[in-house]
Amino acid sequence: MEFKDYYAILGVKPADDLKAIKTAYRRLARKYHPDVSTESNAEEQFKLVAEAYEVLKDDERRAEYDQLREHRNDPNFGRQTQHGSAHNAEDFSDIFSSMFGEHARGQQHRQRRQGMRGQDVEMEVAIFLEETQAEQTRTIRYSLPVYNAFGMVEQEIPKTLNVKIPAGVGDGERIRLKGQGGPGTDGGASGDLYLIIRIAPHPLFDIVGHNLEIVLPVAPWEAALGAKVPVPTLKDSILLTIPAGSQTGQRLRIKGKGLVGKKETGDLYAVIKVMMPPKPDEKSAALWQQLAEAQQSFDPRKDWSKQNG
């Protein structure tokens, strides 16, 4: 039996994962299916593609094949088997045939009897930030493709599930629903469904781990004199004390008002941003002028002179 490069047959690389191999197989199986293709050698190519896939989809057989593929040009390979009997280099084709010829067909037959596991399915689920704070039940609707033995989609099966989203889930977290993926073939087990959580952007809060950040606008006099100002949280509103002399960028910690996690609850950080009022009228301008005269020693750009030596 002549050596066959199964990776080249499927058009994949030796480093590609099972998902890439499966995708290539289905594409080529549809291309060369005798009922679809008009090419003269379609049936032969179809069988070759199926043979390659049967070997590469199985981890153990793929490892054996990779070893043979790596050493196929080594004149010393195969001279000594695990049972101690010697082989000539010319026996390489016999080794390949024994492992991937009749043996392979026997493996295929056993695998067909055992059935093939269904595909795993992934889908994204968008939730609002507030919904992460308590367990939620969501109705999930999706469709599952059903493939025939030749890798072609026969039908789409619509499914509806009521799924519990646990409290404390984070963006990008995967929730596994066992057996809710694609159906198996020939009695094989169904695949799993993986829900990927996507938290919708919030108009007020930014997520930093289990903590939240909110930009807190304050008036110049609030920053200068200190004040108590209302600050929204995910559940309610609190009064936060602004210390006198606060600056833009200063962070004030509000303990326990962040995200509810599975092991801990984060904090909320209010980031101060001093906001100037609109263009002052005559009275306001006079007051600002008085302030400027009272604070003549204050130079907001003094650090520039230090940096310039």
UniProtKB/Swiss-Prot annotation:
GO terms for molecular function: bent DNA binding; unfolded protein binding. PROSITE patterns: DNAJ_1, DNAJ_2. GO terms for cellular component: cytoplasm; nucleoid. Keywords: Chaperone, Cytoplasm, DNA-binding. GO terms for biological process: chaperone cofactor-dependent protein refolding; protein refolding. InterPro entries: DNA-bd_curved-DNA, DnaJ_C, DnaJ_domain, DnaJ_domain_CS, HSP40/DnaJ_pept-bd, J_dom_sf. Residues 5-69 form the J domain. It is found in: Cytoplasm, Nucleoid. HAMAP family: CbpA. DNA-binding protein that preferentially recognizes a curved DNA sequence. It is probably a functional analog of DnaJ; displays overlapping activities with DnaJ, but functions under different conditions, probably acting as a molecular chaperone in an adaptive response to environmental stresses other than heat shock. Lacks autonomous chaperone activity; binds native substrates and targets them for recognition by DnaK. Its activity is inhibited by the binding of CbpM. This is Curved DNA-binding protein.
